[in-house]
Structures are given as structure tokens and as C-alpha cells.
Amino acid sequence: MRSLKLAEGCKGTQVYALNPSAPTPPPPPGNSSTGGGGGGGSGGGTGGVGDKLLQHLSDHLRVNSVRSKSSRTYPPPTQPNAVVSPEFLLPCGLPVTDLLEPQIDPCLKFVDLVEKMAQVYRRIENCSQFEKSGAYLEQCAIFRGISDPKLFRRSLRSSRQHAVDVHAKVVLASWLRFERREDELIGTTSMDCCGRNLECPKATLVSGYDPESVYDPCVCSGASRSEMMNEDECSTSQEVDYDMSFCIGDEEVRCVRYKIASLSRPFKAMLYGGFREMKRATINFTQNGISVEGMRAAEIFSRTNRLDNFPPNVVLELLKLANRFCCDELKSACDSHLAHLVNSLDEAMLLIEYGLEEAAYLLVAACLQVFLRELPSSMHNPNVIKIFCSAEGRERLASLGHASFTLYFFLSQIAMEDDMKSNTTVMLLERLVECAVDSWEKQLAYHQLGVVMLERKEYKDAQRWFNAAVEAGHLYSLVGVARTKFKRDHRYSAYKIINSLISDHKATGWMHQERSLYCSGKEKLLDLDTATEFDPTLTFPYKFRAVALVEENQFGAAIAELNKILGFKASPDCLEMRAWISIGMEDYEGALKDIRALLTLEPNFMMFNWKIHGDHMVELLRPLAQQWSQADCWMQLYDRWSSVDDIGSLAVVHHMLANDPGKSLLRFRQSLLLLRLNCQKAAMRSLRLARNHSKSEHERLVYEGWILYDTGHREEALAKAEESISIQRSFEAFFLKAYALADSTLDPDSSNYVIQLLQEALKCPSDGLRKGQALNNLGSVYVDCEKLDLAADCYTNALTIKHTRAHQGLARVYHLKNQRKAAYDEMTKLIEKAQNNASAYEKRSEYCDREMAQSDLCLATQLDPLRTYPYRYRAAVLMDDHKESEAIDELSRAISFKPDLQLLHLRAAFYDSMGEGASAIKDCEAALCIDPGHADTLELYHKAREPNDQK
């Protein structure tokens, strides 16, 4: 670990496994067990418990076949030591291959992702400043497809930064807020401001293009309207020379003729244009739909241009008057004034009708802003649904410039997350289609509507929308066309579609995965193996192979197959499958561990073909597993910590939270583990729960700081840490401050300050899990400062409290002291202790000769194909051996499923050295799409473009 900002220096706890090597799975159960309960000599007593479990499960399936929330509790089985046959826990039986099929990704997916990323980069660079927001939105759609939340949020921020009109600012700022799910934070309101113009609900209502100011502090906490008044109310002042009156009913409103005339051309024509009213001192205004209070307000505005002291109902009257008599300045003032009054859902529901009727652009924008900042709860309000979902509602919004692709892109994503099959989702996607103009917009809208229709089993409509997406240029939608044909018993037709796709284009993992559905036997397995070779992150091939092994009664091999992907990707569906098979093997401890882990990732997960809630399976399995007290759980957590078993650690924390759900410290640890597993969405949910359950203000501030830091708000996170320290000195506050400060290139003074902060953290009370991490990070800073002996002391102290990752830091110290053998041995110790040890093999490769390094890196890739260093090393070795094409192939293999910045940069450099300028430029552009400020890539890009620029 070179610095705190590297992956190995993650702030998260490294929580480790009880047994570094998993035990050999027991053989599959035989068929000799009786129907009463277990396969043993327990007799009738066991059968009675089995009957209770069966009845319990059957009742659950009958009454609660579909459940959407996890908040219910279930009565556990009464006997804790029962021996129960798997049949009672699996009334649906074991999984079968015939029921397995991969989901179609609802996001944009490309045959040549690198080319698409390069195109988007060129579009962003070459378009006008007023088109940049839309270009960044397309980039958002691409990054959504590669499941990188940080890249997605960065593009979304850029889209908001370059937004010009109020509507786009409102939608994009609300979307940014939703991505942090601040609606889940107790004690906050939808209109709370984060302190920057980027998301400030008042700043979004200011039109104009000013990208440089979006990160400035906002002025929403400045002076109120009343404080801005610099003159007294003067509507009845004797200094005013009234020269006419408007008569409304029995009352008169005295006015200044030329002031009223200045409100609009119609008023000027009426009062000075030869009409009979020109000669009258009193004009009857009774039939013009305005009250005496309204007319008095109009008179005051005509002299002061202010609306500050008028109640909303009077301002609404003025808005109507302004529309009737074309008073543009008055209308603009009323629109702005009313817009700044909208702060709640009830106010927004009331005022949006006035806004739409009176064509008040800002007022409607303000109401929309409340609806959007109240998401997802506002999506369940029938009045909000009517405005957003109906064709009439969209037309009304469009008449004011408030129906956009951006709006419906945002809304449809939320609806699909909430319920893919709902009518609301369908209607929002239909509105999205109506708003789609650009090619990529049509591709996305058509494809997503096809996916939803497929989920609803409306196959003809699904096929129609998938075909439309293909015609718009989205080749991945051919997967949807083939699937809908397959569902309608046109299997051969489906096969031909995907076979042609593979023949006509460079094959990808998802192509072979899809074709496997439409063939059988060895051909199916060959396609699945090819899919894994092209893209090892696809979960379906592992699941299918595992279930095929189960069908052959090879349970241990099935578990081993799933372990391959779960070693580097915490996939809920693979955890479910492993738990399912474990129950069949009567490994209830293993099943319970996996179910607890997947419920941490997805709390509302429905298991076994959406039949049983995961929480219910926990209740059924819990009596069959070893019972732990909270103290036992802490010991288990330490054991898993020391053997780098993150999934096992998640299961232990889930168990502990079941006993103490309000423990914010446990929620925080859970979030850190999830970040280590690259499950950011679940991690942020745990962080929010930690913040909500915090018992003190200083603790709450720390969790708020981590939320801000993890969503890209480093300065705000530092401020939270400092505020927490000012209230009470604590380990976590000092650690947060040190971590946030270290997330940059440190000069000597900054490094010394980070060292002081970590030393202060270590003086504060905490447990060994966190102190080990602090010692590890402190050692990293000492290494960067070339204080190797102090670093070695830190790593040694960390190892004494079972912070196993410290072996890696100590190995680096040995390496810097030219003790290469000691460094190698230190990494070997980590490999022996760690259950997840791909990174350890990768790091050990730095401390041995080329042949041994190659061996270690091959193992690292086998264990975790997402690690990019092994590909880069092997490619560099091939280039040194003048095997250019093999080096390019090595990098391309990884880029095809992980378009990584470093991989793209290295391949671009190789292309440049080979004289293939066009390929080098394309890879540079794709890399700059990921990080537009990457200095080395920018330098290479300009160099590769020089021949073209000279031409």
C-alpha cells in the first residue's frame, strides 16, 4: 500500500474468516432418509419437528408468496437442536437448469464499448458549451451500463455543472441528491441544502450558464426578502401624486396613471391610447377578475417593483392579472416570488396547477423540484403520478418546457428499481420514448421498454420495442428480440439471430451466454465456457454449471464452481444459489452464512424463484446452526478478520445486528466491509443507517462525513470531522480527517500532519479491528516519508492485533531495505492466512524473479480476473520480448470486460509505439472519457494526434 488513497489502504475494516481453508463439503444426502425428518436414528421426535417446519413453510408460501418488505418477524422453530431433512427446507426442490436464464441488462450495452466511450469523449470536447450537459448525460447512460457508481456520479455532476436552463438544473440537482438517498436520513427535509450551488434548491431556479460557480458556496442562508427591503412601504404615502382610481365593487384603489401604464402595452393603450378610459379619473374594474387587495398590490408593485409583503393568494391574483394584461415584468416577479415559496409536497401539489394554468415557468419548476427531491416516496402519490405518467400531464409540462428526456430518464430509473413490472414504470417509459430525440436516447428508451415488457410476459410488445431499439442502432437489443422469440417457442429463430450477431461482429461474453440458451448438450456448455473466458464477471455461466453438477449429484463440485466467482464478486444471485445447494447438502451453517450476506446486500431478497423471503429462511435455519452470544460473535468477527473472509464477516455482522439492530458502530463496520467488496450502493445504505442510529452528535457527524467523502465531497467531509473533534475527540473523527487529508499528493508538512492525526486517533478508545487499520495506514505514511523503522514498528504492532493485511506493508519495508527474500516470505505468510488472497499473490510477484512472478500473477488472475496489474505486467513482458500482437491481445482480453484507465493507457502506448496512430488515439479518448484529467494519457493523446493535426 503506497498511500492511504490506494485500494489496499481502504478505510474499511478487513474482516476475516474463521477457517482459512474451507472444509471439504460433505457428500450429498442419500435417498434413504425417511419422510419424517432427518436421516438418523432420531425417530418420531425428529419427524415431529420436521412436520412443524414443513407446516410453517407451507403456511408461509400460501399466505405470503410475494412479499416486498423485510420488516416482519417470524416465529422460529421451537427446538434448537433438530435434525431436519433438506426436503422440509426446500419445498420447491433443488434448482434445475431448465428454469435458469440470465436477465437482460436494462442499460445500454455495446459490441465495442471502447469505440463508444471514445465517441462520447469527442462529442464532449467538440460540442458547444450549451450542448455539453446533454453530452455528459449520454456519458452517464454509458457508465450506468458498466456499473461504476463513482463514474456515473461524476458525469451526472458534470451534466448539472453545464446545465443552462432551470428545468435541467432542477432535474439534475435532484438526481444527484437522490443518488445519495438523503431521503433516508432521519431529521432532514427534502429542501435541505448541501451548501453548494451544485445542488442548492434556490440556485437551481436561476437560469443561465455559469459552470465555474456550481461548486461555490450557495447564498440560500443569506438575507431574507424582508431584510433586503431598503425603503418603507409607500402605497398610502402622502408623497404619491395619485391621479386616477380603479373602482372594484364599492371600493376604489387610487393609482398613478403613468405607473400603471408602464406595466404593459395593453394598460398603456387603455390609459393613453384614445380609449374612453383615458379621460376618466375613475375606471370600473369590477369585471376583470381581481380583488381590491389584488389591485392595491398591483398599484404598489407599479411604484416599487416589489412583492415582498403580499400573501401568496394576492400574488396569485397578480399573476392572473399579469397574464390577462400582458404585464411581463409583473408576471416574472410573481413567478419568481411564488417559486421561492414552494417548500413542501402539499404546497407543490396546490401551486403546480396554478403554475400550469398561468404558464408560470419558474413556479412549475419549483413544484417539480419538490416532487423530485421527495423521491421515491412522492412516486406513490396519485396526484404526482398523474402529472408525470399521463400523456396529458406530459403535454402540459411540455407546453412550459418542463417535459424532457432527462426528467423521464431519472423517473424511469427510480420506477424500474421500485417495481419493474408496474404500470407506473410502463407509463414513465412511454413518456421517455415520446421525449427521445437523439439516437442514444431512442436506443435506451426502446430497449428499457422492451425489458419491462419482457418481465411482464407481454412478449409481442417486448419484441416490438426491442426491434425498434435495434433499428435505432442498439445491437445488444437483439438479445431481447431473440429472447422474446424463444419465449414464443421460436427457438431456432432465436438461435439464428444470436449466431448471426456472433458471426458479423467481434464476439463478446454476453453473445455466447445468450446463444447458450438456444442450444443443448456440449454445445451449450462450450458457449458458457466461452462466455466466461470472454467475460468472467457474468454470473449466469457459473450458476448454470453449478446446477448442472447438482443434477449429477456432484454437490462439492457445484459449490467449488460458485466459489470461483464469489471469490471476486459478491453477487446476491450466486450467494443465493450457493445457499440453496448448501441446504441440499445439509450444510446449514454455510447456507445461513450466505443468506445473511446476501440480505446485507439486498435486504428484501426473495429466494428460491421469488417464493420465500430471505429473512424467513434465516429464521428457519437459525435453530439448525450453532448458537452464538454477542460475545461469541465478536470472537467470530476477529477470526474472520484475521483470515480475510469478507462474506463471512458480513454474515457475522448481520447476526450481531439481529440482536442489536440499533448499534450504529456495527452498521458502520458493515458499510466498510461492503466498500471492500465493491458493493457501494449497499455500503451507503449501511452508512445512512449508522448515521440514523447514532447516539451522539459527534458520532453522527463522523458518519455524515463518510457519506460526503464517499460521494465525492472531500472538503465537506473534512469539515464534519473537524466539527466532530471540536465536540469530542474520538478515534473515528481523527481517522476520517486523516483519511480525507491523505486523499491527495502529500508534501512533507501534510504527511507530518496526517501522522499526528493518526497518532491522536490511536490514543482514543477503539477496538483492535479499527486500531489495526490505523496502524497499517500510519505505517504507509511513514513509508512514504522514508521512515522505514517507524513503519515496520506500526506494521508489527498491527499484526499483533491480527490485522493480517499488515504483512503486505511489512513486506514493502523489507523490499525498500533491499531484503527481497524477507519481503517474499512476508507475503507468503499473508497468502497462507488470507482466504481472499488474490491481491497477496499479486503483491508477492514484485518480490521474486520473472518466472515465479508470472506464476503468482496467473494465480491472481485466476482468483480475481478484475485485478488489472497482472494483465499489464504480462503485456509488458510480451512487449519486451517483441511479441506486440500477443501483448495487445493480453490487454484487450481484460479491456473487453473491464475498460480500465490504466489498461487503456498502456494499450494506447503500445499502439503508438507500433505506429498504429488511429488505434492509439481511440484508446486515449476512451481513457480520457474515464478520467479527462489524466496527465500521462493527455500527453500521449496529443503526441498521437500530431501527425493528423499537421495534415
From Swiss-Prot:
SUPFAM superfamilies: POZ domain (SSF54695), TPR-like (SSF48452). SMART domains: BTB (SM00225), TPR (SM00028). Residues 15-52 are annotated as: Disordered. It holds the Pfam family TPR_8. Pathway: Protein modification; protein ubiquitination. Predominantly expressed in flowers. Residues 242-342 form the BTB domain. TPR repeats lie at residues 443-476, 539-572, 573-605, 698-731, 772-805, 807-837, 868-901, 903-934. Disruption phenotype: Compact rosette with smaller leaves, reduced petiole lengths and shorter inflorescences. It comes from the Eukaryota. Residues 815-854 form a coiled coil. GO terms for biological process: ethylene-activated signaling pathway; negative regulation of ethylene-activated signaling pathway; protein ubiquitination. Residues 33-50 have a biased composition (Gly residues). Keywords: Coiled coil, Ethylene signaling pathway, Repeat, TPR repeat, Ubl conjugation pathway. InterPro entries: BTB/POZ_dom, ETO1-like, SKP1/BTB/POZ_sf, TPR-like_helical_dom_sf, TPR_rpt. Essential regulator of the ethylene pathway, which acts by regulating the stability of 1-aminocyclopropane-1-carboxylate synthase (ACS) enzymes. May act as a substrate-specific adapter that connects ACS enzymes, such as ACS5, to ubiquitin ligase complexes, leading to proteasomal degradation of ACS enzymes. The BTB/POZ-like domain may mediate the interaction with some component of ubiquitin ligase complexes. Interacts with the C-terminal domain of ACS4, ACS5 and ACS9. Interacts with CUL3A. Putative component of a ubiquitin ligase complex containing CUL3. Belongs to the ETO1 family. This is Ethylene-overproduction protein 1. It comes from Arabidopsis thaliana.
